[in-house]
């Protein structure tokens, strides 16, 4: 559970052993889903007995939708099937990956990379690839070149609220397909699997940058540098680069810029106008450019290595 409010701090492992422990906002019971029958049975039970039903894969939900006080939970984390397929429809023909609802972004990335492909997945490797991530939009460091994760979904295999097992795509159950592709996890149906585009892998250019207000000639020059950054951003996005950046307590940090198909020399060229502006403002900075032969290696270099890394441990 991502937000402590939804845990209700009712049973923290850091409490004294003699302190009372209760479920709080956690669910009362959970079903480890193995297939369609488990989902249908849960839906029928909760409707018959007027019990709240929630869906959980990995629990990465800041809004607490993967838990609920007194609820019955469908835990989809064990649906780990994954395969590369040759997909064909009126809207797309080409390679794709079909994953069970329990597959994490890290697992899907490793599977796709072994065959020379990359996927649009999140920074954190333990976030479930389908379900809440892709159906909620799906932010990624590949968004500038490949769009959101939801843009790449070809079809959903789901169980609806009335217990029907269906496939939703632009060609069949299209309203449900569009609702699932950005409408939020656990809202319209229970996802069993998801099929999404994969993209041919390539060299990945990368860069990092940092500067701060302390070493700037003045606060005004630091603010001018920030304004210059806003103006510079579109030039990165327009060529398919995605910078991850932070501003905090007088510090500006770009820990990573991801640019598919670019070399380290390309990154120097891309950043040259902004670095020239920092020099004009008299602001010292630290800049580094580098590259990786493929996206998985780039991910390991910046956010990994998988399965562990600075963002999360393998779930």
Curated annotation (Swiss-Prot):
Query: What's an example of a GO molecular-function annotation for this chain?
Result: FAD binding
Q: In its UniProt entry, what is this protein called?
A: FAD-linked oxidoreductase sthB
Family per record: Belongs to the oxygen-dependent FAD-linked oxidoreductase family.
Q: Which UniProt keywords apply?
A: FAD, Flavoprotein, Oxidoreductase
Its Enzyme Commission number(s) read: 1.-.-.-
Residue ranges of every copy of the FAD-binding PCMH-type domain listed in the record: 19-201
> What exactly does this protein do?
FAD-linked oxidoreductase; part of the gene cluster that mediates the biosynthesis of the phytotoxin stemphyloxin II. The first step of the pathway is the synthesis of dehydroprobetaenone I by the polyketide synthase sthA and the enoyl reductase sthE via condensation of one acetyl-CoA starter unit with 7 malonyl-CoA units and 5 methylations. The C-terminal reductase (R) domain of sthA catalyzes the reductive release of the polyketide chain. Because sthA lacks a designated enoylreductase (ER) domain, the required activity is provided the enoyl reductase sthE.
Give the originating organism.
Phaeosphaeria nodorum (strain SN15 / ATCC MYA-4574 / FGSC 10173)
């Amino acid at each position: 559970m991502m937000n402590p409010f939804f845990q209700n701090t009712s049973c923290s492992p850091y409490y004294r052993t003699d302190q009372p422990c209760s479920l709080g906002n956690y669910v009362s019971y959970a079903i480890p889903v193995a297939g369609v029958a488990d989902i249908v049975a849960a839906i029928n039970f909760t409707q018959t007995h007027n019990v709240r039903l929630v869906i959980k894969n990995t629990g990465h939900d800041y809004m607490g939708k993967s838990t609920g006080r007194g609820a019955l939970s469908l835990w989809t984390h064990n649906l780990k099937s994954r395969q590369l397929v040759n997909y064909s429809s009126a809207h797309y023909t080409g390679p794709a990956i079909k994953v069970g609802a329990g597959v994490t972004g890290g697992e899907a990335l490793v599977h796709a990379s072994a065959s020379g492909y990359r996927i649009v997945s999140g920074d954190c490797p333990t976030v479930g690839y389908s379900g809440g991530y892709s159906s909620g939009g799906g932010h990624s460091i590949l968004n500038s070149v490949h769009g959101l994760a939801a843009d790449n979904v070809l079809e959903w295999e789901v169980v609806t609220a009335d217990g029907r097992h269906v496939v939703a795509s632009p060609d069949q159950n299209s309203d449900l397909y569009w609702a699932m592709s950005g409408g939020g996890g656990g809202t319209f149906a229970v996802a069993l699997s998801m099929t999404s585009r994969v993209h041919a892998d390539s060299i990945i250019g990368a860069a990092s940058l940092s500067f701060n207000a302390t070493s700037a000639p003045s606060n005004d020059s630091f603010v001018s540098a920030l304004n210059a950054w806003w103006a510079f951003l579109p030039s990165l996005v327009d060529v398919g680069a995605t910078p991850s950046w932070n501003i905090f307590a007088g510090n500006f940090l770009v820990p990573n810029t991801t640019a598919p198909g670019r070399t380290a020399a390309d990154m120097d060229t891309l950043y040259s106008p902004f670095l020239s502006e920092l020099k004009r403002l008299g602001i010292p900075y630290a800049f580094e450019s580098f590259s990786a032969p493929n996206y998985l290696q780039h991910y390991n270099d910046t956010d990994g290595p998988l399965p562990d890394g600075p963002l999360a441990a393998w779930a």
